[in-house]
């Protein structure tokens, strides 16, 4: 989930801008490339968030006890390739969600909305909400596939899907089209607050790093450091919604397609806090940060390089 400084401060020179359609392709491609590297962390985060679901602390087995031991547990149970569970669904989600998000934000930039006070945050939040809605079915399948594992280390409900298409077909057949958007009520605020927080903090964080003169002027290390600092704010506001999203997406449903554990966002928040304590809303926050930091930087790097290529093709010889 990243938007670069170039997007946050729209260029006045048209030669430095690409069309919203191009931004859609570049943004989706960049985030998909980043997803390939960070998906193992997403698998670990998902398992940690489901571990001990609606059980009091200390009353359940803990096959996952931290980042390193969790990676080892996944590799032992599912093989090394198990660390890439749900990758196809993750790529689909990143492509859909970020494609829509970059496209909508680029439209806002072209219209001059981001130059208004608070426009950057509002545009980022709205673009994030729209992207989350479009990508919700892919996130649903990704979560369920990443939760699947052997009985010895299983956490959360096990859906037993055979793959992305099989999962989509099963959900459609059993729950109808609306079933594909089950859990979207938590996904939309999750991406909305994350997108707004990222946009509100990245520029100032990068500027602060540059003011410290730790790196050479225009060094990519300043972008990296700014992104890592910004990621702290993003994880802090996203983590509770992330836990709730994972649980709503993964819970079993009855024949009418209603969740058997939670009635929705608020119900999940209340039940989780009552039975596991408030800190349960930050389960998996370590891997979440370890994933988001690299994902942010990789997305920025890939997006920036792809954008440079697009601008060269758009204005050859300049």
From Swiss-Prot:
Show the InterPro entries listed in the entry.
Mito_Carrier_Antiporter, Mitochondrial_sb/sol_carrier, Mt_carrier_dom_sf
Where it sits in the cell: the answer is: Mitochondrion inner membrane
According to UniProt, the reaction catalysed is: a dicarboxylate(in) + sulfate(out) = a dicarboxylate(out) + sulfate(in)
GO cellular component terms, alphabetically, are:
mitochondrial inner membrane
Similarity comment: family membership = Belongs to the mitochondrial carrier (TC 2.A.29) family.
**According to the record, where are the Solcar repeats?**
18-111, 115-208, 218-309
Origin organism is Rattus norvegicus
Job of this protein: Putative antiporter that exchanges dicarboxylates and sulfur oxoanions across the inner membrane of mitochondria.
**Coiled-coil region(s):** none
- Alphabetic keyword roster: Membrane, Mitochondrion, Mitochondrion inner membrane, Repeat, Transmembrane, Transmembrane helix, Transport
Acyltransferase found in the keyword field: no
Q: Which PANTHER family match?
A: RE38146P, SOLUTE CARRIER FAMILY 25 MEMBER 34
Q: Which SUPFAM superfamilies match?
A: Mitochondrial carrier (SSF103506)
Domain of life, per UniProt, equals: Eukaryota
Task: Enumerate the Gene3D superfamilies for this protein.
Answer: Mitochondrial carrier domain (1.50.40.10)
Tell me, which GO biological process terms does this entry list? blastocyst hatching
Q: Does the keyword field hold Repeat?
A: yes
Q: Could you tell me the membrane topology recorded for this protein?
A: Multi-pass membrane protein
Name used for this protein in its record: Solute carrier family 25 member 34
């Amino acid at each position: 989930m990243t938007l670069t400084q170039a997007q946050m401060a729209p260029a006045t020179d048209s030669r430095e801008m690409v069309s919203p359609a191009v931004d859609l392709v570049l943004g989706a491609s960049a985030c998909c490339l980043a997803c390939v590297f960070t998906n193992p962390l997403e698998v670990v985060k998902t398992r940690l968030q489901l571990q001990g679901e609606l059980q009091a602390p200390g009353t359940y087995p803990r096959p996952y006890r931290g980042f390193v031991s969790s990676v080892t547990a996944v590799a032992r149970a599912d093989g090394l390739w198990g660390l890439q569970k749900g990758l196809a669904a993750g790529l689909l989600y990143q492509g859909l969600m970020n494609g829509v998000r970059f496209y909508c934000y680029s439209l806002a930039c072209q219209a001059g909305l981001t130059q208004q006070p608070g426009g950057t945050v509002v545009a980022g939040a709205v673009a994030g909400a729209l992207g989350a809605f479009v990508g919700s079915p892919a996130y649903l399948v990704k979560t369920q596939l990443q939760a699947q594992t052997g009985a010895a280390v299983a956490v959360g409900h096990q859906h037993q899907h055979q793959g992305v298409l099989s999962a989509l077909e099963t959900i459609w057949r059993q729950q109808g089209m609306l079933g594909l958007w089950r859990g979207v009520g938590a996904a939309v605020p999750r991406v909305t607050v994350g997108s707004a927080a990222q946009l509100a903090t990245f520029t100032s964080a990068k500027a602060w790093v540059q003011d410290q003169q730790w790196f050479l002027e225009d060094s990519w290390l300043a972008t990296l450091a700014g992104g890592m600092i910004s990621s702290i704010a993003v994880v802090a506001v996203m983590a509770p919604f992330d836990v709730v999203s994972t649980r709503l997406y993964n819970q079993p449903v009855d024949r009418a397609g209603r969740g058997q554990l939670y009635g929705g966002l608020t119900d999940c928040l209340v039940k989780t806090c009552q039975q596991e304590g408030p800190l349960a809303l930050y389960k998996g926050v370590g891997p979440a940060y370890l994933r988001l930091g690299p994902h942010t930087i990789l997305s920025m790097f890939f997006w920036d390089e792809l954008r440079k290529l697009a601008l060269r093709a758009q204005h050859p010889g300049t």
